[in-house]
Amino acid sequence: MQEELKNVPGIQFVDHVAIAVKQGELEGQVRAYEALGFRVIHREEVRGRDQVREALLQIGNGPNLIQLLEPLTADSPVQKLIDKNGGRGGLAHVAFRVGNAQQAFAAMRAQGFQLIDEAPRQGSRGTTVFFVHPRSKAENAFGVLIEMVEDPADK
């Protein structure tokens, strides 16, 4: 897996780990992370196909974040994940920061990765994102949903 990923241009670091939380539990989860020393740096309701309320948390000044995702509707992919997980929250995806989402998308498509999005699209915080299927390649499946994130603040 690492052999192939080194050919994806611009992967910089783990941007965030996303955790699905059940409806009505977002604020309790935020308080739990705040008790560990995290602080909320961003909140947003993401409509469209995602249908989530998010809280983005940071500890110190590090670049690695925790993203808590609460579904807004029964059709939200996050709600479907919770349902699949027996009604419990848990790991939703791992996101990597890339310097150029379009280049990373093209490289991963050329290498045969199964991409969920047809093209990079707008994410929260003004980012550009795309998702890679957990079972993207039979011989090197990730086993978890992967998100690639380009942040305009990096430009």
Per-segment meaning from a language model:
Residues 15, 55, 92:
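Residue-level detector of short, conserved catalytic/binding motifs and their immediate flanks
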Residues 1-10, 21-36, 40, 45, 53-58, 60, 65-69, 73-135, ...:
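Vicinal oxygen chelate
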Residues 1-52:
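Long, hydrophobic N-terminal alpha-helical segment
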